[in-house]
Regions:
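Mixed-charge, low-complexity intrinsically disordered regions
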Residues: 1-83
Length: 83
């Protein structure tokens, strides 16, 4: 699995640019035996400054090509150079 980098800049497949603020854990669903299942990515839209939280695995997932056949980006979020 790809590593999501804190302070990394990522492009969402729909075009918005985000900065990862931190990686955290869901306290309500934390599993001590498998803590990776409760990881969350906290990220900020670089233009609007809105903050979002998404499960780590979802942030790191592939674009659904059946639902979005015209999207060429492979992953939901892909790291880019700072702009």
């Amino acid at each position: 699995m790809r590593e999501i980098k804190i302070n990394g800049i990522y492009k969402h497949f729909k075009g918005h640019i985000y900065k990862v603020i931190t990686i955290g854990y869901d306290s309500e669903n934390y599993d001590e035996e498998n803590p990776d299942n409760s990881r969350l990515v906290v990220y900020e839209n670089v233009d609007t400054k809105e903050v979002w939280i998404r499960p780590y695995d979802m942030f790191n997932s592939l674009v659904d090509k059946e639902k979005y056949p015209d999207i060429t980006q492979e992953y939901r979020f892909e790291e880019i150079e700072e702009r």
